Amino acid sequence: GYTPKDGSCPSENTLISVVAGGVYNKLNNNVNPSSGSVLRFGSEQFLPIGENAPTFNRLRASYSRFIPVRLINFTKECKSDVSANNDCFQTIGFQFKTGTILGELPPYESFCMGGSSSVRGWGSCELSVSKSFAEVSAEYRVPLWRMISGSLFADAGSDLGSQNDVPGKPGKLLDKVGSGFSLGGGIGVKTP
């Protein structure tokens, strides 16, 4: 069976990591974008110090695109024919994220899918514990009243069949489904 002494998950590891990444940002606003796109990619190389420590590389990439629209006119700024798009902040956003781990993957460094920064509507790490993943999201944001805004979203994600590639197969042991989707909405309040 799987135990910490079988080499796949030693009771103690000492690792150092070297991180490299890049961003190509064409967003009109980094905090609350309504148009433009951003491409992010990164690589984190883990190197062992001592015995029984794994060597592996975590690769991640994401692409987000925001398109300004005017579909619903709840606020005064959105009802005006002369207001600019930034007075009537509405946007449709799309995001694609992916990642994989190359090398000797320790289970505690696996990708967890599900949660508020992953596939919303699922609990944190509720969908999968995997070596690779892909997620896609679409969201519509609209101002409702003064500082209150609303959003509708659709998220989906998959472990790309890689839960079995994690030593000890924690995703399978915990009955993680490996892929899923969600539809939902939310209310936000902008604060100064």
Where does each model-flagged region fall?
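Transmembrane beta-barrel wall of Gram-negative outer-membrane proteins
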Residues: 1-10
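Exposed, low-structure sequence patches enriched in small/polar residues
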Residues: 4, 27, 32-34
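C-terminal transmembrane beta-barrel domains of outer membrane proteins
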Residues: 15-18, 35-192
